[in-house]
From Swiss-Prot:
Name of the gene encoding the protein in the UniProt record: purM
Family as reported in the entry's similarity comment: Belongs to the AIR synthase family.
Catalytic activity, reaction form: 2-formamido-N(1)-(5-O-phospho-beta-D-ribosyl)acetamidine + ATP = 5-amino-1-(5-phospho-beta-D-ribosyl)imidazole + ADP + phosphate + H(+)
Protein name in the entry: Phosphoribosylformylglycinamidine cyclo-ligase
Biochemical pathway: Purine metabolism; IMP biosynthesis via de novo pathway; 5-amino-1-(5-phospho-D-ribosyl)imidazole from N(2)-formyl-N(1)-(5-phospho-D-ribosyl)glycinamide: step 2/2
InterPro entries xref list: PurM-like_C_dom (IPR010918), PurM-like_C_sf (IPR036676), PurM-like_N (IPR016188), PurM-like_N_sf (IPR036921), PurM_cligase (IPR004733)
CDD domains referenced in this protein's UniProt entry, alphabetically: PurM (cd02196)
Keywords noted in UniProt: ATP-binding, Cytoplasm, Ligase, Nucleotide-binding, Purine biosynthesis
GO BP field: 'de novo' IMP biosynthetic process; adenine biosynthetic process
Cell inner membrane is among the record's keywords: no
Organism: Parasynechococcus marenigrum (strain WH8102)
UniProt xrefs under NCBIfam families: purM
Length: 343
């Protein structure tokens, strides 16, 4: 008996590393020291920083992975993994520096795993961060053959005196909602139940334009790193930012607000994408659950002074992202919920 007969193919693992090497190295910023193969990835801090704060975040893709693996959308979930981490850390105004990934699988499928890493590298390049390292664990008997799980870890940096922590938010500020690319990577346990109930498959179309349902559900999470970089370089006075993930607007928008402030949102200020209408109709999902599970078309929020609405919306659209003034800040407290949305 040897390791391969026990289910772990070391040679396939080595071949996999060689296959992904060029994709990984293409993400490396000039601050990266060394290459693949060491025990730890190394990176210098960007030059010129005076009081740098490191901002870290970790996340996964959740059960979207099951749907993606059923339909071989491996590249997409690689992008999702980066987006779920990067979109969190940039809310502080931080610049993504590097990313690490962890993949665990029952049996190594070099083609599928390479597509995942190429997706991760794609997401890193879009975000301006280096894919500094990772781990691929082949765990036969623990995970089913042909299935894998993902986790990601991102580190970003911001000057301490440029940190965006929500403390500048005040009543009268405006809330700008930036469009999502779809469901993103939250709520897929519910999505999969709806698909099963509706007996939906690859041929299912939805909405007035009869779009392919599965393709739209598996569209990668929108990355907002280049948008935030553009907003900051435009010298816009950003008071707070929020990444709209699990819990939707009602649970994520209050997270960026200080004591004494509460958000008020008008649900009719943007058009809800038909994809969410299909999910609600096919699954009989109550309106409250819909709001507290999905982003409903708003993937990121920016809080700015009211006189900066037009500049902020224009800056978003310059990055090919739709944006709308969706609400305002009023007196109150974040824990009291968002006025205008289901509690």
């Amino acid at each position: 008996m040897d390791y391969k007969s026990a289910g772990v193919d070391v040679e396939a693992g080595r071949a996999f590393v060689q296959r992904i090497k060029s994709s990984v190295e293409a993400t490396h910023r000039q601050e990266v020291v060394g290459g693949l193969g060491g025990f730890g990835g190394m990176m210098r801090l960007p030059a010129g920083l005076r009081q740098p704060l490191l901002v870290s975040g970790t996340d996964g893709v959740g059960t979207k992975l099951e749907l993606a693996q059923d339909h071989q959308a491996h590249h997409n979930v690689g992008i999702d993994l980066v987006a779920m981490c990067v979109n969190d850390v940039i809310t502080s105004g931080a610049q993504p520096l590097f990313f690490l990934d962890y993949m665990a699988t029952g049996a190594l499928s070099p083609d599928a795993m390479a597509e995942v890493v190429e997706g991760i590298a794609d997401g890193c390049q879009q975000s301006g961060c280096s894919l500094l390292g990772g781990e691929t664990a082949e765990m036969p008997g623990f995970y089913p053959a042909g299935r894998y799980d993902l986790a990601g870890f991102c580190v970003a940096v911001v000057e301490e005196n440029e940190l965006i922590d929500g403390q500048q938010v005040q009543p009268g500020d405006a809330v700008i909602g930036v469009a999502s690319s779809g469901v993103h990577s939250n709520g897929f346990s519910l999505v999969r139940r709806v698909l099963a109930q509706a007996k939906a498959d690859r041929s299912t179309l939805y909405g007035p334009d009869q779009r392919p349902l599965i393709d739209d559900l598996l569209r990668p999470t929108q990355l907002y790193a280049s948008l935030v970089k553009h907003l900051l370089s435009s010298s816009l006075p950003i008071h707070a930012m929020a990444h709209i993930t699990g819990g939707g607007l009602p649970e994520n928008l209050p997270r960026c607000l200080p004591t004494g402030c509460r958000a008020q949102v008008s649900p009719t200020s943007w058009a809800r994408p038909p994809l969410f209408d299909w999910l609600q109709s096919a699954g009989g999902i109550p309106e409250r659950d819909l709001w507290h599970t999905f982003n409903l078309g708003i993937g990121f929020c920016v809080v700015v002074p009211r006189d900066q609405i037009d500049r902020t919306v224009a800056a978003c659209r310059a990055q090919q992202l739709q944006a709308w003034p969706i609400g305002s800040i009023v007196e109150g407290n974040p824990e009291d919920g968002v006025i205008g949305l289901p509690d």
